[in-house]
């Protein structure tokens, strides 16, 4: 799932090659139209094999559109994913709703048409880059305001900049809110 075309969300694409070579099959990747165009422009070798290359393509690019659910097949049952649009500076990034979980990694605003996707959540993973304003990311206070407004059972703040100390932030957060950490596992109800 690609949320948008920025480098911090796309430049790990080459790290998928060993997985594909091990599995001996391409991986399905999902992106909206603008992100897909950007991926093809920068990483076309991941989707097609140039005539001079012995490396196979590694990804099948599948379309995503805000407001249109898609079933993602895997080893178990298909997972129903609902992409929805988010303001991220000058662009629209995607957030994802999967059952009772919402993932909104890069945003500085939530359009009215995306509010329903954030209702009745068990878990909301939400961007909070830093304490001071940023043109394309929520601050900690903005994230907490939205958490208070939408009332998920649990919220996890992610995408924190290096100037946010994990322990200090966690000590200040409401009981149902915590800071994310590398290796964190989230168990969903049901």
Where are these regions (language model features)?
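Binuclear metal-dependent hydrolase catalytic cores
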Residues: 1-104, 116, 170-190
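Binuclear metal-ion centers of metallo-dependent hydrolases, dominated by the metallo-beta-lactamase
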Residues: 67, 111-190
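A general structural motif
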Residues: 84-88, 105-112, 135-138
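Short, hydrophobic beta-strand segments that form beta-sheet elements in well-ordered domains
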Residues: 102-105, 156-158
């Amino acid at each position: 799932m690609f949320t948008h075309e920025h480098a911090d969300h796309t430049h790990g694409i080459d790290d998928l090659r060993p997985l594909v070579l091990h599995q001996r099959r391409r991986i399905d990747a999902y992106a909206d139209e603008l992100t897909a165009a950007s991926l093809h422009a920068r990483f076309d070798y991941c989707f097609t094999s140039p005539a001079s290359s012995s490396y196979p393509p590694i990804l099948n690019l599948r379309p995503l559109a805000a407001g249109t659910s898609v079933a993602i097949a895997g080893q178990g049952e298909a997972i129903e994913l609902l992409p929805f649009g988010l303001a991220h500076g000058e662009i629209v990034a995607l957030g994802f709703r999967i059952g009772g979980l919402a993932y909104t990694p890069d945003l500085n605003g939530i359009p009215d048409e995306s509010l329903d996707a954030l209702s009745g959540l068990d878990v909301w993973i939400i961007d909070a880059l830093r304490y001071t304003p940023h043109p394309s990311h929520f601050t900690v206070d903005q994230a907490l305001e939205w958490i208070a407004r939408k009332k998920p059972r649990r919220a996890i703040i992610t995408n924190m900049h290096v100037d946010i100390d994990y322990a200090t932030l966690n000590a200040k957060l409401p009981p149902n809110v915590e800071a994310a950490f590398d290796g964190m596992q989230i168990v969903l109800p049901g």
